[in-house]
């Protein structure tokens, strides 16, 4: 999504600029809000809990939407290897990544309590103990929910204390009208 908005911005010389929309900023900050420690992120449904986030993409997003949260996150993830994501991205992003400069280092912190009411997600982080709890309400009609009415994960640092058991092997039944019998 960000790449599409950035291409529109670049090709129109900034005349098409959607980055000041509050929803666009909130979409970008989602990754910062869901980051726990290091490469560990809150994961629900069939998402992995470890990802390698693209610091340069996050830096550009932060600059475009004027988000200190994203800029600080990008600085904390920065490496001197802009080619780290070349297999999974586009030539346009490769060029942008090569040209991106490291943002000024700022202390990366997130709020202690984060709530996304439309997603029914609550995240609580305690820097003193290193405990981080995430809970999600839900129902089976949500995308990617298969017999899933909620979830809770608890981490201490980068180590899981309590996690969702994960997904079973997907079969054609998983995506059929019989999925609730699994």
Describe the role of every protein-language-model region.
Residues 3-162:
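Carbohydrate-active enzyme catalytic cores, enriched for enzymes
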Residues 162-182:
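C-terminal, non-catalytic macromolecule-binding modules
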């Amino acid at each position: 999504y960000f790449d599409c908005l950035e291409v529109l911005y670049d090709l129109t010389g900034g005349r098409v600029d959607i980055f000041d929309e509050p929803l666009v900023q909130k979409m970008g900050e989602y990754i910062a809000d869901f980051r726990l420690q290091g490469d560990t992120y809150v994961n629900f449904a069939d998402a992995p809990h470890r990802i390698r986030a693209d610091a340069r993409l996050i830096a550009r997003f932060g600059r475009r939407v004027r988000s200190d949260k994203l800029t600080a996150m990008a600085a904390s993830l920065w490496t001197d290897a802009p080619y780290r994501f070349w297999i999974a991205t586009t030539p346009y992003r490769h060029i942008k990544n090569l040209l991106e400069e490291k943002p000024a280092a700022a202390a990366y912190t997130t709020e202690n309590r984060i709530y996304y009411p439309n997603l029914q997600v609550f995240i609580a982080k305690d820097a003193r103990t290193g405990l981080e709890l995430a809970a999600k309400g839900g129902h089976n009609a949500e995308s990617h929910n298969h017999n899933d009415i909620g979830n809770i994960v608890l981490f201490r640092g980068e180590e899981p204390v309590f996690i969702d058991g994960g997904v079973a092997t997907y079969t054609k039944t998983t995506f059929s009208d019989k999925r609730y019998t699994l």
